[in-house]
Amino acid sequence: MAKASNAELKRFTRECVYEAFFRLLQTEEYEKITVSAIAAKAGVSRNAVYRNFESKDMILKSYVREFAERVAAELKSERIDSDARYVTFLFTRLCEFREPAKILAGLHMETLLLEAFLSIRDHFAVKTAYRDYYENCRIGAFFFIYLTWLENGCRESPGELCALVRQIVKKTF
């Protein structure tokens, strides 16, 4: 059997830490969770956690950033050619992210979610004044619709959310 590379071990450690931290967040208050508790739940040493993350805040920030990077990479490879497909794709990925997002919203860390939205936008925004306004309007709408969707129990499908966004845009503008 081939030996795992350092990069693979690092990725595995990070994934274990993410999973452990989110499991702890389901049952314990954020402030009461220690790096030692995260390490124990992940089955790694405290040093392994600190080699990968400066703090427990950075665990959350890194998790959200990595999610946004994966979505941006998928969007690039999909070559999405219409706003409707873009919105449906984005809400499909965000639907998969709902459990971590609910935890972050419950911790009043919505700004981390907004940073993810902005990061995804930055990969695709055409650098013109008009496009910047357009993208910011669109991302703001996605962000607050996503938060509302989380608060309402995630009842609608990504396709239904896309239709809702299109309806709102038509009525608003």
Predicted features, each with a name:
Residues 43-53:
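Short hydrophobic/aromatic patch on the recognition helix
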Residues 16, 34, 48-50:
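Residues in the helix-turn-helix
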Residues 1-10:
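N-terminal intrinsically disordered/low-complexity leader segments
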Residues 32, 55-60:
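Short amphipathic alpha-helical segment with a characteristic S/N-K-E followed by hydrophobic residues
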